């Protein structure tokens, strides 16, 4: 999955019954750090001191699933800046014969002709702000804006096939592949 917070990654997973195949940094954070409240709205309690533990658990789960040859959905933004690419970190662990797909949940919110124009990004941010307000656990909008900026400059590795969450047939093919894995 790819996209800033509130772009629909977790909703996509739930709507398609992929929870049993999913690893999520946020779910690990909730188990370790709990929930806090911001103006009466629940937020995932982000504790910088536990982030190394969150990622240790995340990668242990990922490595175990890969060793067991299980299809795995990663419910994280999978975006970063300053030359770090979380997808490359994941690819280092994936067996060579695996095909890695990324479902981009942010692309459908952008203008297809000029996706990173100010108008397109502002429109997408309005949608993200509304979704963020309506979701179970909100995220500070400054963080969402930062991840939107990361998306603009983010490069997907060549080995990865990117599918828009709006491309229903391709997305369904991937979902079927995961759900029908034997």
Region locations from a protein language model:
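Short acidic, S/G/P-rich loop/turn micro-motifs used as interaction or catalytic elements
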Residues: 28-29, 79-81, 169
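Alpha-helical scaffold elements adjacent to nucleotide-binding pockets in ATP/GTP-utilizing enzyme cores
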Residues: 86-90, 123-131, 174-177
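Hydrophobic anchor at the beta1->P-loop junction of P-loop NTPases
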Residues: 1
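The conserved Walker
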Residues: 4-5
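Conserved substrate/cofactor phosphate-moiety recognition/catalytic segment
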Residues: 10-70, 111
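Glycine-rich phosphate-binding loop used to anchor ATP phosphates in small-molecule kinases
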Residues: 49-105
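A glycine- and Lys/Arg-enriched "phosphate-lid" helix/loop adjacent to the NTP-binding pocket
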Residues: 31-45, 94-155, 161, 165
